[in-house]
Amino acid sequence: MLAIDQGTKFYIKLNYPLSNFGTPAIIDWGFFKLLFVENKGMAMGAKLNDFLPFISDNTAKLILTIFRLIAIVGLGYWLWNSIKKQTHPLLNWALTLIFAGAIGNIIDSVFYGVIFSDSYGKVAEIFPEKGYAPLFYGHVVDMLQFPLVEWKWPSWIPWIGGEKYLFFQYIFNVADTAISTGVGILIVFNKKVFPKSI
């Protein structure tokens, strides 16, 4: 999973410039689009300083990256311990998917700023003389979108009435899919993977 994630990200970065709003998708099949965007924050583009406005973008990015590294260590320990204790295979699969996805995204955050040039209006170069950001300040590469249904909210609904809405508008990557699948397994099969102690 990690190899597929990094392979797709390298392919996108080394073959396409960043997708800007209004520019055509790399692939557009209606229900599926292949794009190239970079996420400087966390899920759905949110940044830590969106919630804590008194910290700078750089401080927010560093805190987020350090938190992700600590979470990966904890997740790795949980996975190692689960395998050692021979817990339910679904738990091990779920944790492996989450761990691989987390590693995939942390590679982007920690190293991509150093090993790639920027992609604004041009295709990135690998191992340039100077990368687009220092170590720990890279951006996560996202490229997959499934815009399934678009509608306009009825005008009588407060705050959002008359607004257009696109379901599933978010752009994500293979690592995000692995994390979501792992979490989904834990939720759907929670009674199997977390049996009650007697």
What are these regions (language model features)?
Residues 1-198:
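Alpha-helical transmembrane bundles and membrane-interface segments of multipass inner-membrane proteins
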